């Protein structure tokens, strides 16, 4: 082989070696990249969109559920919470808030989500007790000594009284208060005209309409506006824990059963891949541990065991339901709280 041929052969050999080395490098790098970009087992997170006065409850429920899930599955998860007026929360979910679960204080705010296709129309059949793992009722909180001598619903319509109630258009708390006052007249043998007059007199006495129950509590306790606050039973107990004997709780002769329904927001949960965790989260509310925490936060549990255990925390109350008087939440909503309904006609006269 002459010198020129030898040089050409040497160049070809070295080029082939470089190509092989480069290919091997790419292969190794590719394996490294595949390893580097292998999907990690990220912690699943769910958001619970709830109503205004359940902050403290779910601050205890959430870590208890996370620990229970970890123990059963070995998986790490997180649960976040969002709070506001019940109807505001429903609207937020409709507008894009990615809550895998909702825990509301009235069925109508979940029905609205079903009407928008975010969850099934039969959502109330997905969990026990019409998907309501706990309930409460509406009571009064007065200043120390109850100086205005408030005892029952009719007292809230007396001239000169200042009553703090959240807005029934945005808050389930406000709707329950409105309906309880209305129904107190009907259940006592009164007419619709008399019920309307009481509610009209009551709202003449409302100096400010907060958007949710917690805002109303702040107005009454910290801004010191009003003679009486109408709110959920659990909220007044929390106020008494924080402020001691500065306030008194008054139970009216009759009040309303305020159920707290829950649901998996299927469209969101399926999009995020959180349905399994979301469903387990709501089932946890019915467990012994969940019902125990519910009762400790002065919400009335469904479990007979928990109800008996915490019986001293809950005064017997003569309760009626929205179904009893109105035939259901949809009918009550349409008649009283839809635009142009009874509340609008009453409040515009104020």
Feature map (PLM): residue ranges:
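Extracellular/periplasmic juxtamembrane helices and adjacent flexible linkers that interface
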Residues: 269-350
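Ligand-binding pocket segment of bilobal, Venus flytrap-like solute-binding proteins
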Residues: 188-254
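N-terminal segment of the mature folded domain
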Residues: 42-170, 311, 318, 347-349
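Short beta-strand->loop
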Residues: 49-51, 142-144, 162-188, 202-206, ...
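Bacterial N-terminal signal peptides that target proteins for export
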Residues: 4-25, 35-36
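C-terminal segment of classical bacterial N-terminal signal peptides
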Residues: 30-39
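Sec-exported extracytoplasmic/periplasmic mature domains
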Residues: 62-71, 94-98, 107, 114-118, ...
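Short helix-loop capping/hinge motifs at secondary-structure junctions, enriched
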Residues: 145-151, 170, 183-191, 268-276
